[in-house]
Amino acid sequence: MNLAIIAGDGIGPEVIGEAVKVLDAVLPEVEKTTYDLGARRYHATGEILPDSVLEELKVHDAILLGAIGDPSVPSGVLERGLLLRIRFALDHHINLRPAKLYSGVTGPLAGNPEIDFVVVREGTEGPYTGTGGAIRVGTPHEVATEVSLNTAFGVRRVVEDAFRRAQQRRKHLTLVHKNNVLTFAGALWWRTVQEVGAEYPDVEIAYQHVDSAMIHIVTDPGRFDVIVTDNLFGDIVTDLAAAVCGGIGLAASGNIDATRTNPSMFEPVHGSAPDIAGQGIADPTAAIMSVALLLAHVGETDAAARVDKAVEAHLSSRGDQELGTAAVGDRIVGLL
């Protein structure tokens, strides 16, 4: 495997260092190329993601990202110029977010119910395409629009991926949308789920409005196996899912090109946390869990399972220990 590494800003280099340590322990033959992208490069050169670097990224099998963002750079500059550019240039049309409450992790829900589902979120359409505008800005008659773009092609490929994942899991898929109000997009999503679902007769299909789904993620999370949803609703659902599983510090994600034409990118959900950068106290668990997602995606399923089991063993036995960044990485390597 040929891996591109973007450690990024803040705690990114620290947590990615431990993630790579675990990766080397389970798959030592990986070829790695590190790219200096983020705030430091921006300040030094004015560059965010040069075309030449983007072309280099495309030839890798996968990308491992730490975190992007620094208070010295105006908000949104790095996010749009780096993260969103990679997402659209590499057609990362799926954002994959597992939600699992591990043994030993105390979640906010009473009784620590069993939680194990995955959210398949559409990643390149919806209201995040920049389609819209404003007129009469700053006047009492200002009009602003944000258009949610949904295509049959874009919806189908995400729904197909979700069904494939459901078939490999507990064979239950829930579409989360708001089709009683968003009637046009909602109809396209629901019709597509029914059409694709006919090809997977063993997968049970359910529908929930997004507000209802948010309630049930809190009150009855065990009902969910695979959730498929659009870009906006997925953005919201995945953060609540992370919260009930112990927080974004334990959340991993994958930005996936399901066609495998381009390399997919894997990253912890947490931010760059510049306030604790360089102190050696950032928890690298989410970055290590992202390595497990990456390994599963490239077909190294045994290695992925080893990492996941080691993370679970670490979380279930750490107790109240306050471990530093390197200590967590060393401990998980020891549990492989």
UniProtKB/Swiss-Prot annotation:
One of its GO terms (biological process) is L-leucine biosynthetic process. It is found in: Cytoplasm. Its main location: cytoplasm. It catalyses: (2R,3S)-3-isopropylmalate + NAD(+) = 4-methyl-2-oxopentanoate + CO2 + NADH. Its EC number is 1.1.1.85. It is an enzyme of class 1 (oxidoreductase). Pathway: Amino-acid biosynthesis; L-leucine biosynthesis; L-leucine from 3-methyl-2-oxobutanoate: step 3/4. Its cofactor is Mg(2+); Mn(2+). Binds 1 Mg(2+) or Mn(2+) ion per subunit. Substrate binds at R87, R97, R121, D211. Keywords: Amino-acid biosynthesis, Branched-chain amino acid biosynthesis, Cytoplasm, Leucine biosynthesis, Magnesium, Manganese, Metal-binding, NAD, Oxidoreductase. NAD(+) binds at G271, S272, A273, P274, D275, I276, A277, G278, Q279, G280, I281, A282, D283. GO terms for molecular function: 3-isopropylmalate dehydrogenase activity; magnesium ion binding; NAD binding. Mg(2+) binds at D211, D235, D239. GO terms for cellular component: cytoplasm. The record marks Y128, K178 as: Important for catalysis. Homodimer. Belongs to the isocitrate and isopropylmalate dehydrogenases family. LeuB type 2 subfamily. Catalyzes the oxidation of 3-carboxy-2-hydroxy-4-methylpentanoate (3-isopropylmalate) to 3-carboxy-4-methyl-2-oxopentanoate. The product decarboxylates to 4-methyl-2 oxopentanoate. This is 3-isopropylmalate dehydrogenase. It comes from Mycobacterium sp. (strain KMS). The gene is leuB.
